[in-house]
């Protein structure tokens, strides 16, 4: 049904700082489309006062989840009232291009306006938007919403001056600096589609993505900093353009302060500071709800690059809703997602989510250890009054490995710290319990994917979910994500039976709308195996209470003599023994059983016994916790495991290595040399 509309009504729910769009502006840009429209919602719906409850919680998780499944149009229509729109949508949900779902059809908005301008118009311009903390350069800065707008609107003007228009693509190749966020927001401001590529990717990988995205312009910086080394970005960009097919019109370079200027060839290469000094501010350009905000390339693909496309309107609605409903934050509180802008967590929860919701976001250019030590996280939490932290379990393990008693953290008072969220990989129980003990706050695991852009399962503490869920789970289905566990024949499995984790369609707002220039792969990869469902390609189970336990990728399930054993369950069993700091389990080919599990283990520093004795203890413990069916009896001890920069273990690469097959090292691996060490240890053990 077509909703009735109220023109320019301010909404005061958990979007908090939200309101109408500007009536006029001296800047260039949006032209006559200046007015905001928001839906009042029918009497008695979850909108208005009820919408506030929807965003602020009150133990209503079950009600909200049921409403999101039975009447998604009504549920998300009310959540969308927290966002300011130039033009109302005519239909909340449409499945015209199945399996992709269109949300807020024909509605027009601008996500940069919602993230920055509207807060300033509501008197919050002097509030801190970004805290930049860079131990690698010994730099700290606080940046207000007003200051962000000044930089972003001028940068938008620079882009337009050099021919970038709505619908054009822009590649951003930058380190963890505020200018990377300004670039994202400036693209969004004018309706350009950004593709932010992890700073430090090799030229070949960068070239592949540039050729696929075909950007009008590339934005980069003079250099980035990785552990122990400075990475010069401009030569990497130059080489990528030399070996690639596509040539962008211009390359805009930000020269980082206190360093030598990068010499620029006049005409083609543009200097950031010089361009901004003469730039005119540019206003927000309205875009349709389905307009792509960004392309984010994911790893692990062959053939055409897998570029996840994120539609603007649904993403804005979901992120704003999630900051309060999932993460339990109030506008104005300090939030820190300890990730990289190049990953989906960085897009959603360093940049867009916290700013949409009116929070202060911490942008951290450092590591959990080594910048300068394992007390770094505690310092940032204390110094900036962080209310909630989002990090990967691998970061916690790194801290624990270097400082088992968290002695370096004891000097800091974490008075404002309320909740620690972990995601990115399965969090073993021992890491979870250690985190609770040293941070003294609830530690909540949750699960999501690049494709979804926000959590699929979580403890929605803003909706009254428990802050002490059972260990090992990754939360319950987030409203909008109707999660089910199916076998390969599409039969629903009983509680605690390992199977395929799928989501019944439609996917909620914020999920991807396709793969850039590859819709055939979009349909084939995610929707063909289980028609009517989104295939997460993860394996796990659900308990009787509805908690979801994500065990591993489907292809990480090891088939031992016909028994399906989760690599994640074996890893958790090994880690729970307390003598192994980190481990990865892969299937080793076996002539009798098909596959047998092999564990690559990193011992804790303080273990004073032989590897033979440790292996005996591990084998005994796995038999007790998993059972003899796992046929576990082999481990190889290594000094460290390879990890991607987002903290994931490249299991498929390790599996190939263990089985003596050719393998390719992903450009996202932190220390590629570790594979040679593991290869040597495997030869020594065989």
From Swiss-Prot:
GO terms for biological process: lipid metabolic process. The modification N6-succinyllysine is found at residue 517. The modification N6-acetyllysine is found at residue 523. Keywords: Acetylation, ATP-binding, Ligase, Lipid metabolism, Mitochondrion, Nucleotide-binding, Transit peptide. Its EC number is 6.2.1.1, 6.2.1.17. It holds the Pfam family ACAS_N. It comes from the Eukaryota. CoA binds at residues 226-229, 623. GO terms for cellular component: mitochondrial matrix. The keyword Magnesium does not apply. This is Acyl-CoA synthetase short-chain family member 3, mitochondrial. It comes from Bos taurus. The lineage of its organism: Eukaryota, Metazoa, Chordata, Craniata, Vertebrata. The gene is ACSS3.
């Amino acid at each position: 049904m077509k909703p009735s509309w109220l023109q320019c009504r301010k909404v005061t729910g958990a979007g908090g700082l939200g309101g109408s769009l500007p009536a006029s502006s001296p800047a260039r840009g949006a032209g006559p489309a200046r007015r905001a429209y928001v839906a009042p919602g029918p009497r008695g719906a979850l909108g208005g006062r009820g919408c506030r409850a929807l965003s602020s919680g009150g133990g209503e998780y079950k009600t909200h989840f049921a409403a999101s499944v039975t009447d998604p149009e009504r549920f998300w229509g009310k959540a969308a009232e927290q966002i300011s729109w130039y033009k109302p949508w005519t239909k909340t949900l449409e499945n015209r291009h199945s399996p992709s779902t269109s949300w807020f059809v024909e509605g027009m908005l601008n996500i940069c306006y919602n993230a920055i301008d509207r807060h300033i118009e509501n008197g919050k311009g002097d509030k801190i938007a970004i805290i930049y903390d860079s131990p690698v350069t010994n730099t700290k800065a606080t940046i207000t919403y007003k200051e962000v707008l000044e930089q972003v609107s001028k940068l938008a003007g620079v882009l337009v001056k050099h021919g970038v228009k709505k619908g054009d693509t822009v590649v951003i190749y930058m380190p963890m600096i505020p200018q990377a966020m300004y670039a994202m927001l400036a693209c969004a401001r004018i309706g350009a589609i950004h593709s932010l590529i992890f700073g430090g990717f090799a030229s070949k990988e960068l070239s592949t993505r540039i050729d696929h995205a075909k950007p009008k312009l590339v934005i980069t910086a003079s250099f980035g900093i990785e552990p122990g080394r400075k990475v010069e970005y401009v030569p990497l960009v130059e080489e990528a353009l030399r070996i690639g097919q596509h040539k962008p019109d211009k390359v805009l370079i930000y020269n980082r302060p206190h360093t030598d200027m990068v010499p620029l060839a006049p005409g083609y290469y543009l200097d950031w500071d010089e361009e901004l000094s003469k730039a005119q501010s540019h206003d927000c350009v309205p875009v349709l709800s389905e307009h792509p905000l960004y392309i984010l390339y994911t790893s692990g693909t062959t053939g055409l690059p897998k570029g996840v496309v994120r539609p603007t309107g649904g993403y804005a609605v979901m992120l704003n809703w999630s900051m309060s409903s999932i993460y339990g934050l109030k506008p104005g509180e300090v939030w820190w997602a300890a990730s990289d802008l190049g990953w989906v967590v960085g897009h959603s929860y360093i940049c867009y989510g916290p700013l949409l919701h009116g929070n202060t976001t911490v942008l951290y250019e450092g590591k959990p250890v080594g910048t300068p030590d394992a007390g770094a996280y505690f310092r940032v939490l204390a110094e900036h009054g962080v209310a909630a932290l989002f990090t990967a379990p691998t970061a916690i393990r790194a801290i624990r490995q270097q400082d088992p008693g968290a002695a370096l953290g004891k000097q800091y008072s974490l008075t404002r710290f309320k909740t620690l969220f972990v995601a990115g990989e399965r969090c073993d129980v021992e890491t979870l319990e250690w985190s609770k003990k040293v941070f003294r706050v609830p530690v909540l695991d949750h699960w999501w994917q690049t494709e979804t852009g926000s959590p699929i399962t979580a403890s929605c503490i803003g909706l009254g979910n428990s802050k002490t869920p059972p260990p090992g789970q990754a939360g319950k289905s987030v409203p909008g994500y109707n999660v089910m566990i199916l076998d390969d024949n599409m039969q629903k499995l009983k509680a605690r039976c390992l199977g395929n984790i799928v989501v019944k369609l439609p996917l909620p707002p914020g999920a991807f709308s396709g793969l850039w220039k590859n819709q055939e792969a979009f349909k084939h990869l995610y929707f063909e195996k289980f028609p009517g469902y989104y295939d997460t390609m993860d394996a796990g189970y659900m308990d009787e209470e509805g908690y979801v336990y994500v065990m591993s990728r489907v292809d990480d399930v090891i088939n031992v003599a016909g028994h399906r054993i989760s690599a994640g369950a074996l890893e958790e069993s090994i880690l729970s023994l307390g003598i192994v700091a980190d481990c990865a389990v892969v299937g080793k080919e076996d002539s009798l059983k098909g596959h047998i599990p092999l564990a690559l283990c990193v011992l804790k520093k303080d273990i004073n016994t032989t590897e033979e004795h440790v292996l005996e203890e591990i084998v005994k413990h796995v038999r007790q916790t998993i059972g003899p069916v796992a046929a576990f009896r082999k481990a190889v001890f290594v000094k460290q495991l390879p990890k991607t920069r987002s903290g994931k273990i490249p299991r498929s690469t390790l599996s190939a290595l263990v089985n003596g097959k050719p393998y390719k090292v992903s450009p996202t691996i932190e220390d590629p040399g570790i594979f040679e060490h593991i290869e040597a240890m495997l030869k020594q053990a065989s």
